[in-house]
Amino acid sequence: MWSLLLVPISMICYDYLKSPIDLLYFSKLGRPLLGIQNTFRDIIHNTSKHIVRNYPGLFLIKMHHKNIREEFDRIAPTLEKKYYHDIDPWFEKNDNYYFYKIENFPVLYSLVKQIKCIDTSVAAFAVVEGPMIIPPHRAESNKLLRYQLTIHGNGDCSLYTGDGRHIHREGEDILFDHAKYHELIKTGDARRVTLILDVHR
Protein backbone atom coordinates (compact mmCIF):
# COMPACT_ATOMS: atom_id res chain seq x y z
CA MET A 1 0.00 0.00 0.00
CA TRP A 2 2.64 2.51 1.07
CA SER A 3 4.81 1.51 -1.86
CA LEU A 4 2.13 2.86 -4.22
CA LEU A 5 2.72 6.33 -2.80
CA LEU A 6 6.34 6.18 -3.93
CA VAL A 7 5.30 6.63 -7.57
CA PRO A 8 3.58 10.05 -7.24
CA ILE A 9 6.13 11.19 -4.63
CA SER A 10 8.98 10.27 -6.98
CA MET A 11 7.29 12.12 -9.84
CA ILE A 12 6.88 15.24 -7.70
CA CYS A 13 10.51 15.06 -6.56
CA TYR A 14 11.71 14.66 -10.15
CA ASP A 15 9.82 17.79 -11.18
CA TYR A 16 10.81 19.80 -8.10
CA LEU A 17 14.51 19.00 -8.40
CA LYS A 18 14.83 20.20 -11.99
CA SER A 19 17.33 23.01 -12.35
CA PRO A 20 16.76 25.71 -11.31
CA ILE A 21 14.80 24.69 -8.23
CA ASP A 22 11.64 26.77 -7.93
CA LEU A 23 11.57 28.28 -4.44
CA LEU A 24 7.83 28.97 -4.82
CA TYR A 25 7.09 25.35 -5.79
CA PHE A 26 5.13 24.42 -2.66
CA SER A 27 3.48 27.81 -2.19
CA LYS A 28 0.45 26.63 -4.19
CA LEU A 29 -1.54 23.57 -3.14
CA GLY A 30 -2.03 22.37 -6.71
CA ARG A 31 1.62 22.61 -7.72
CA PRO A 32 2.60 19.04 -6.71
CA LEU A 33 -0.24 17.74 -8.89
CA LEU A 34 1.17 19.81 -11.76
CA GLY A 35 4.52 18.22 -10.97
CA ILE A 36 3.08 14.74 -11.54
CA GLN A 37 1.60 15.87 -14.86
CA ASN A 38 4.91 17.50 -15.85
CA THR A 39 6.85 14.32 -15.15
CA PHE A 40 4.36 12.24 -17.12
CA ARG A 41 4.71 14.57 -20.12
CA ASP A 42 8.51 14.54 -19.78
CA ILE A 43 8.45 10.75 -20.04
CA ILE A 44 6.26 10.84 -23.15
CA HIS A 45 8.11 13.68 -24.89
CA ASN A 46 11.61 12.90 -23.63
CA THR A 47 13.18 12.61 -27.09
CA SER A 48 10.97 15.16 -28.84
CA LYS A 49 12.68 17.94 -30.77
CA HIS A 50 10.85 21.24 -30.81
CA ILE A 51 10.84 22.24 -34.47
CA VAL A 52 8.57 25.02 -35.75
CA ARG A 53 7.66 23.22 -38.99
CA ASN A 54 6.19 20.32 -36.99
CA TYR A 55 3.37 22.59 -35.76
CA PRO A 56 0.85 23.35 -38.53
CA GLY A 57 0.70 27.02 -39.43
CA LEU A 58 3.30 28.20 -36.92
CA PHE A 59 5.76 29.01 -39.72
CA LEU A 60 3.35 31.75 -40.85
CA ILE A 61 4.34 33.92 -37.89
CA LYS A 62 7.94 34.24 -39.06
CA MET A 63 6.81 34.72 -42.67
CA HIS A 64 4.82 37.79 -41.56
CA HIS A 65 7.65 39.28 -39.49
CA LYS A 66 7.79 42.51 -41.48
CA ASN A 67 4.04 43.15 -41.20
CA ILE A 68 4.06 42.27 -37.50
CA ARG A 69 6.95 44.68 -36.87
CA GLU A 70 5.23 47.50 -38.77
CA GLU A 71 1.99 47.02 -36.82
CA PHE A 72 3.90 46.94 -33.54
CA ASP A 73 5.79 50.14 -34.36
CA ARG A 74 2.56 51.90 -35.28
CA ILE A 75 0.35 50.81 -32.37
CA ALA A 76 2.64 50.16 -29.38
CA PRO A 77 3.43 53.86 -28.73
CA THR A 78 -0.31 54.48 -28.21
CA LEU A 79 -0.70 51.74 -25.57
CA GLU A 80 -0.16 51.63 -21.83
CA LYS A 81 2.76 49.43 -20.77
CA LYS A 82 1.96 46.34 -18.69
CA TYR A 83 4.73 45.29 -16.29
CA TYR A 84 5.71 41.70 -15.60
CA HIS A 85 6.38 42.45 -11.94
CA ASP A 86 2.69 43.38 -11.57
CA ILE A 87 1.44 39.96 -12.67
CA ASP A 88 4.10 37.58 -11.34
CA PRO A 89 5.70 37.81 -7.86
CA TRP A 90 8.80 36.02 -9.17
CA PHE A 91 9.89 39.17 -11.03
CA GLU A 92 11.49 42.00 -9.11
CA LYS A 93 10.19 45.51 -9.82
CA ASN A 94 11.64 46.54 -13.16
CA ASP A 95 10.15 49.30 -15.30
CA ASN A 96 12.37 48.28 -18.21
CA TYR A 97 10.65 44.90 -18.66
CA TYR A 98 7.07 45.14 -19.86
CA PHE A 99 4.59 43.79 -22.40
CA TYR A 100 1.66 44.52 -24.68
CA LYS A 101 -1.13 41.97 -25.21
CA ILE A 102 -1.61 41.02 -28.86
CA GLU A 103 -5.36 41.69 -28.69
CA ASN A 104 -4.39 45.34 -29.28
CA PHE A 105 -2.83 44.47 -32.64
CA PRO A 106 -5.73 43.45 -34.91
CA VAL A 107 -3.80 42.18 -37.93
CA LEU A 108 -1.52 39.97 -35.83
CA TYR A 109 -4.39 38.83 -33.63
CA SER A 110 -6.39 37.78 -36.67
CA LEU A 111 -3.43 35.75 -37.95
CA VAL A 112 -2.75 34.07 -34.61
CA LYS A 113 -6.39 33.03 -34.16
CA GLN A 114 -6.18 31.11 -37.45
CA ILE A 115 -3.29 28.94 -36.22
CA LYS A 116 -4.86 26.18 -34.16
CA CYS A 117 -1.71 25.09 -32.32
CA ILE A 118 -1.38 28.50 -30.62
CA ASP A 119 -2.83 29.18 -27.18
CA THR A 120 -3.56 32.92 -27.08
CA SER A 121 -4.01 33.29 -23.31
CA VAL A 122 -0.56 34.81 -22.71
CA ALA A 123 0.26 36.00 -26.25
CA ALA A 124 2.16 39.27 -26.00
CA PHE A 125 5.02 41.44 -27.17
CA ALA A 126 7.71 41.36 -24.46
CA VAL A 127 9.97 44.42 -24.33
CA VAL A 128 13.37 44.70 -22.65
CA GLU A 129 15.04 48.12 -22.51
CA GLY A 130 18.71 48.45 -21.64
CA PRO A 131 21.04 45.86 -20.12
CA MET A 132 19.26 43.18 -18.11
CA ILE A 133 19.60 39.71 -16.68
CA ILE A 134 16.58 37.51 -16.09
CA PRO A 135 17.99 34.73 -13.90
CA PRO A 136 17.49 31.01 -14.62
CA HIS A 137 13.85 30.05 -14.23
CA ARG A 138 11.17 27.73 -15.58
CA ALA A 139 7.41 27.71 -16.03
CA GLU A 140 5.15 25.82 -13.63
CA SER A 141 3.65 23.60 -16.33
CA ASN A 142 5.10 21.94 -19.43
CA LYS A 143 1.70 21.52 -21.06
CA LEU A 144 2.61 24.24 -23.56
CA LEU A 145 5.79 25.10 -25.43
CA ARG A 146 7.05 28.66 -25.81
CA TYR A 147 7.55 30.30 -29.21
CA GLN A 148 9.46 33.57 -29.62
CA LEU A 149 9.94 35.71 -32.72
CA THR A 150 12.32 38.64 -32.41
CA ILE A 151 10.66 41.82 -33.69
CA HIS A 152 13.47 44.20 -32.73
CA GLY A 153 16.91 43.02 -31.68
CA ASN A 154 20.48 43.70 -32.72
CA GLY A 155 22.11 40.64 -31.19
CA ASP A 156 22.92 42.12 -27.77
CA CYS A 157 20.35 39.86 -26.10
CA SER A 158 20.62 36.10 -25.72
CA LEU A 159 18.25 33.42 -24.46
CA TYR A 160 19.95 30.39 -22.94
CA THR A 161 18.13 27.05 -22.76
CA GLY A 162 19.18 23.46 -22.26
CA ASP A 163 19.81 23.36 -26.02
CA GLY A 164 22.28 26.24 -25.91
CA ARG A 165 22.28 29.93 -26.83
CA HIS A 166 19.71 31.68 -29.01
CA ILE A 167 20.65 35.22 -30.06
CA HIS A 168 17.72 37.60 -30.45
CA ARG A 169 18.12 39.00 -33.95
CA GLU A 170 15.28 40.50 -35.97
CA GLY A 171 13.22 37.90 -37.77
CA GLU A 172 14.73 34.91 -35.93
CA ASP A 173 12.49 32.53 -33.99
CA ILE A 174 12.80 29.75 -31.44
CA LEU A 175 10.51 27.09 -29.98
CA PHE A 176 11.47 25.60 -26.61
CA ASP A 177 10.14 23.98 -23.46
CA HIS A 178 9.92 26.88 -21.04
CA ALA A 179 9.18 24.53 -18.13
CA LYS A 180 12.88 23.67 -18.27
CA TYR A 181 15.89 25.86 -17.55
CA HIS A 182 16.13 29.13 -19.45
CA GLU A 183 17.60 32.55 -18.72
CA LEU A 184 18.09 35.83 -20.54
CA ILE A 185 21.17 38.04 -20.68
CA LYS A 186 21.07 41.42 -22.43
CA THR A 187 24.29 43.44 -22.53
CA GLY A 188 23.50 46.47 -24.69
CA ASP A 189 21.27 49.54 -24.53
CA ALA A 190 19.11 48.78 -27.59
CA ARG A 191 15.48 47.79 -27.13
CA ARG A 192 14.65 44.12 -27.62
CA VAL A 193 11.09 43.20 -28.61
CA THR A 194 9.92 39.61 -28.98
CA LEU A 195 6.54 38.18 -29.83
CA ILE A 196 5.76 35.49 -27.26
CA LEU A 197 3.26 32.73 -28.02
CA ASP A 198 2.40 29.51 -26.22
CA VAL A 199 2.02 26.43 -28.42
CA HIS A 200 0.15 23.19 -27.74
CA ARG A 201 2.48 20.19 -27.78
Sequence positions of predicted segments:
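Fe(II)/2-oxoglutarate oxygenase catalytic core
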Residues: W2-L144, N154-C157, R191-V193
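Residues in well-ordered beta-strands of folded domains
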Residues: A124-A126, T150, Y160, I185, ...
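Short, flexible loop/turn elements at secondary-structure junctions
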Residues: V127-M132, L149-G155, K180, V199-R201
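Short beta-strand His + acidic residue motifs that chelate non-heme Fe in jelly-roll/DSBH
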Residues: I134-H137, S158-Y160, F176, H182-G188
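A short hydrophobic beta-strand segment most commonly corresponding to one strand
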Residues: R146-T150, L175, A190-R201
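A short beta-strand-loop-beta hairpin characteristic of the jelly-roll/cupin
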Residues: I151-E170
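Conserved metal-binding segment of the jelly-roll/cupin
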Residues: I167-Y181
